[in-house]
Regions:
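Sequence context of c-type cytochrome heme-c attachment sites
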Residues: 53-58, 68-71, 84, 91-120, ...
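Substrate-binding/catalytic groove segments of enzymes
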Residues: 140-143, 240-241, 271-273, 286-295
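N-terminal export/targeting leaders of redox proteins
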Residues: 1-68
Length: 326
């Protein structure tokens, strides 16, 4: 009996071994499929969230920069409001040395030097590097830029617009000032995550559809939604910093934590009741219809935008009266 059992044992052991090998093969197949799926997901995620500059040929189509148009875009964009020294006036407002610290729920962003200085500023950048930073949020080394820089609005500038602006900015005084790095905690200090933010919120299309807009309103739409980047402050945001859908220019909490930013749609209790002429006057002089004056962070905005021709201020006013009331 014992002899017969001992003779069967090798067969049983061999049988179990075959089962083990079959199970191991199945697990290996499952794990292999899992690895492929994870790898494919990682590749897809990278493809969707990687920095996406314009094609190189996009910038080669421009000709000589129109410096007068570039200056208008400079003032419309409020470049001096963030990149010049606080309170700078006259020619000092054209020294874009950086220095402003923007406090947000995500940390503190230090506004950089964008003067023509080749080391501390952007003087060594090519048009493509400048343009991709402005309109795609991609830095000179191919990195994501944080959306504290409003490239989501500047994305509406054409290649010619960017060329004109950069041409003008290269005529401004250089500065050797060097700003400290941003002060952001994890995970906001990971630029890779910005690619996911762009996937969710970066959009270069119209913020609102205005089917019956005339040329004046269309010009105002370009100025407000594009270089003027009015929505960056006047539109409420969600927890991830994206615009609240359907609330364009409806106002909301001050992103820097103090007070609120007003509603500037026709549904506002204040500016909503103003006429186009009154809005134009406010943008030009800083005085409201009640003879009050502009205050807070809007002081710097109004000071910059007042450099625009009256026709542009009228276009902005027409657009603000045309957007949906909120």
């Amino acid at each position: 009996m014992l002899e017969r059992l001992s003779q069967r044992q090798p067969f049983r052991s061999a049988l179990m071994s075959e089962k083990d090998r079959a199970m191991a093969a199945r697990w290996a197949k499952v794990l292999g499929i899992g690895v492929v799926v994870v790898a494919a997901g990682a590749v897809t995620a990278w493809a969707l969230t990687k920095p996406q500059p314009h094609e190189a040929g996009y910038w080669s189509s421009v000709g000589q920069a129109d410096l007068a148009k570039g200056e208008q875009l400079f003032w419309a964009g409020g470049c001096a409001g963030c990149h010049a020294a606080e309170g700078a006036e006259g020619d000092a407002a054209k020294i874009l040395s950086g220095g402003l610290a923007l406090k947000s729920p995500f940390g503190t962003f230090h506004v950089p030097n964008i003067s023509p200085d080749p080391k501390a500023g952007i003087g060594s950048w090519t048009l493509a590097q400048f343009g991709n930073a402005m309109t795609r949020g991609v830095g000179p080394n191919g990195e994501h830029l944080y959306p504290s820089f409003p490239y989501g609005s500047y994305a509406r500038l054409s290649a010619a617009d960017v060329n004109d602006l950069y041409g003008y900015m290269k005529t401004l005084p250089p500065s050797s000032n060097v700003e400290p790095p941003h002060e952001l905690g994890f995970p906001f200090n990971q630029r890779l995550a910005v690619g996911g933010w762009k996937l969710l919120y970066f959009d270069d299309g119209p913020r609102v559809e205005l089917a019956s807009a005339d040329d004046k309103v269309k010009r105002g739409q370009f100025l407000v939604e594009g270089p003027g980047h009015c929505g960056e402050c006047h539109t409420p945001r969600n927890a991830l910093g994206g615009f609240e859908k359907g609330q364009w220019l409806a106002g909301g909490p001050n992103p820097e934590g103090q007070g609120s930013i007003p509603n500037i749609t026709p549904g506002s209790k204040d500016i909503g009741a103003w006429s186009e002429d009154e809005i134009t006057e406010y943008l030009s002089t800083g005085f409201t219809p009640d003879f009050d004056s502009v205050g807070g962070s809007m002081v710097e905005v109004q000071k910059n935008i007042a450099h625009l021709p009256k026709s542009d201020l009228q276009a902005i006013a027409a657009y603000l009266k045309a957007v949906p009331a909120r």
